[in-house]
């Protein structure tokens, strides 16, 4: 179904003509998940996003559907259980997006190590138990020092004790958002990007009955009426709530900044994802991850109070991450000049909650007796000598023996909250990208109840555990063969097998729609046929309105294909200008915007300071 600039125009027109059941403010993963479930459940749904979809937090993650093994250091079992359960659901409803990737976790004999070899084995066994992983090759494996170095010979050898391998999943975060958005659009939701909420419409009792917004592309004010409004703006949640609390600061959110850096794979060669202690005795771990022909690593985790729209990578961030990777990979000698791209994102953490974080510091202490008892019980369970109930009981004993420490940025809860203010505004905040579906389900359960109680409207919530996102109509047990079948179809449209396979992996069950565009398109000047199809599909079916939307979020060109990016800039802008009938002034403005984003990602300013 078309999802284009014209779709946007019609959506804004219809939003101003209706009294929606639900208006969603925010088009990141949380808002996208709410929109999908609301529209599929029959609610008259609208969604506005002030930037591009996923432009804020949801395209700036570590790009994993992460199981959270790190939580098991302190036996935050409930968190890991929820996370791996939801990860399995995401695999079911978006099978073309998460891809299994065994993660290597080296263990070093040094102060502040997250795991000893023994604790790592216990944690991995518990992790597999919670994830339902029981058979090879997915099951975890303990490695000797020699086996770790055989896998990753460039790792630091000094102090290396061994390691482990466990199952994790890589993710395309921005694609997960847009596929949820597209499905919501197909089910009737009215959706528009680049529309900013500016204030609430209130009735005589100071209850919200809609939103005053501004179309940032035309600078026109828009009035949208809705029975209920939900705030899913992540780091901006407090700002939206502030509309009706003027003069009364709201501090529910405590954003932290996470930075990732990208270098060429030859500069930092890793054959598989690596998750390793920083070696700085700061209680933190970093990921070093291969993607395309690049390697990226991160993340930092620091409190943030700056510009929410444009968080920047600082010299301090770069120094920290380069220090870590050069310590763990001593022969790499990565410098700032090797950095090809980067991103800084804000985590929408909630204030006032303490828990351990998969990248974070130790937030609690487990007594030796509780730990030993849990270890013995898990071992007995694995040997079929004890029950799952016994494991659960031992886990509860560990949880009750845990004492909290003072919060640091990495120990703030990744938990979510769903609140309703006195004026009727719902706010769904916090959480991890893996939890988005469950968060939306909880919110919609409450919203549907309120619609019945306050407005006499009844809806049945869709079973979102089995409701695929756009592109996700693939058998989860047969993903590789179905993707390959789509790729074969692409070759019949004149694509090379490599290009067809790339597009099939990117678009899943929507790949035939992409290939069908060859009936009306030929390769644009300066672009391959595959690139031309991808660009036009993004413009007509994914509401890509700007070059940055295409290069950074509909594809990963700007992050992981930096070598070929420069050659694509002019042809893509030319094709978009032709498609959207841009004036010369608009075309120049779009190119300037793209080059500014590229300069930010390339760290041009920091590199220039060093040269100066």
UniProtKB/Swiss-Prot annotation:
It catalyses: sn-glycerol 3-phosphate + O2 = dihydroxyacetone phosphate + H2O2. Its cofactor is FAD. GO terms for cellular component: cytoplasm. One of its GO terms (molecular function) is glycerol-3-phosphate dehydrogenase (quinone) activity. SUPFAM superfamilies: FAD-linked reductases, C-terminal domain, FAD/NAD(P)-binding domain. Its main location: cytoplasm. Transmembrane segments: none annotated. The keyword NADP does not apply. The keyword Flavoprotein applies. Its EC number is 1.1.3.21. GO terms for biological process: glycerol metabolic process; glycerol-3-phosphate catabolic process. It is found in: Cytoplasm. Keywords: Cytoplasm, FAD, Flavoprotein, Glycerol metabolism, Oxidoreductase. FAD binds at residues 21-49. Residues 398-408 have a biased composition (Basic and acidic residues). Belongs to the FAD-dependent glycerol-3-phosphate dehydrogenase family. This is Alpha-glycerophosphate oxidase. It comes from Streptococcus pyogenes serotype M18 (strain MGAS8232).
């Amino acid at each position: 179904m078309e999802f284009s600039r014209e779709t946007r125009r019609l959506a804004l027109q219809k939003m101003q003509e209706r009294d929606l059941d639900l208006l969603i403010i925010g088009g990141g993963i949380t808002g996208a998940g709410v929109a999908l479930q609301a529209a599929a459940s029959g609610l008259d749904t609208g969604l506005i996003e002030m930037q591009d979809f996923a432009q804020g937090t949801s395209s700036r993650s570590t790009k994993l559907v992460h199981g959270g093994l790190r939580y098991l250091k302190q036996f935050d079992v409930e968190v890991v259980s929820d996370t791996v359960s939801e990860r399995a659901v995401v695999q079911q409803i978006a099978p073309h997006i998460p891809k299994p990737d065994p993660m290597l976790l080296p263990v070093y004999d040094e102060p502040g190590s997250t795991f000893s070899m023994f604790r790592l084995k216990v944690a991995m066994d518990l992790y597999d138990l919670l994830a339902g992983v029981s058979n090879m090759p997915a099951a975890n494996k303990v490695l000797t020092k020699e086996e770790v170095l055989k896998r990753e010979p460039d790792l630091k050898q000094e102090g290396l004790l061994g390691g482990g391998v466990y199952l994790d999943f890589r993710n395309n975060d921005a694609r997960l958002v847009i596929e949820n958005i597209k499905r919501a659009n197909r089910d009737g939701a009215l959706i528009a990007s680049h529309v900013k909420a500016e204030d609430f419409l209130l009735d005589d009792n100071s209850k919200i009955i809609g939103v005053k917004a501004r179309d940032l592309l035309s600078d026109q004010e828009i009035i949208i009426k809705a029975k209920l409004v939900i705030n899913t703006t992540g780091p901006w949640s407090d700002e939206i709530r502030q509309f009706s609390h003027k003069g009364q600061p709201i501090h529910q959110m405590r954003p932290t900044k996470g930075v990732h850096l990208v270098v060429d794979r030859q500069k930092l060669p890793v054959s598989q994802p690596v998750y390793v202690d920083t070696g700085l005795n700061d209680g933190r771990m970093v990921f070093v991850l291969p993607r395309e022909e690049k390697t990226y690593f991160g993340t930092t985790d620091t409190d943030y109070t700056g510009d929410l729209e444009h968080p920047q990578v600082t010299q301090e961030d770069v120094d920290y991450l380069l220090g870590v990777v050069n310590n763990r990979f001593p022969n790499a000698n990565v410098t700032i000049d090797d950095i090809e791209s980067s991103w800084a994102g804000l985590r929408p953490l909630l204030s006032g909650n303490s828990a351990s974080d998969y990248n974070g510091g130790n937030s609690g202490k487990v007594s030796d007796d509780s730990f030993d008892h849990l270890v013995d019980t898990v071992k007995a369970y694995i040997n079929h000598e004890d029950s799952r109930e016994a494991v659960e009981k031992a886990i509860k004993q560990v949880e009750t023996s845990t004492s909290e420490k003072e919060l640091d940025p990495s120990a703030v809860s990744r938990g979510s909250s769903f609140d309703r203010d006195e004026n009727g505004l719902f706010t769904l905040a916090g959480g991890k990208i893996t939890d988005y579906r469950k968060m939306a389900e909880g919110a919609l359960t409450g919203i549907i109840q309120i619609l019945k109680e306050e407005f006499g409207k009844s809806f049945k919530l869709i079973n979102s555990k089995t409701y695929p996102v756009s592109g996700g109509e693939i058998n989860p047990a047969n993903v590789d063969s179905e993707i390959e079948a789509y790729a074969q179809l692409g070759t019949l449209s004149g694509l090379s097998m490599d290009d067809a396979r790339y597009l099939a992996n990117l678009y899943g069950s929507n790949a035939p729609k992409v290939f069908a565009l060859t009936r009306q398109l030929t390769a644009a000047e300066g672009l391959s046929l595959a690139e031309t199809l991808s660009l036009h599909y993004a413009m007509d079916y994914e509401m890509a309105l700007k070059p940055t939307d295409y290069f950074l979020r509909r594809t990963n060109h700007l992050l992981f294909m930096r070598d070929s990016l420069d050659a694509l800039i002019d042809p893509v802008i030319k094709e978009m200008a032709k498609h959207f009938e841009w004036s010369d002034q608009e075309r120049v403005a779009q190119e300037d915007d793209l080059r500014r984003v590229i300069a930010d990602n390339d760290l041009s300013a920091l590199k220039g300071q060093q040269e100066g």
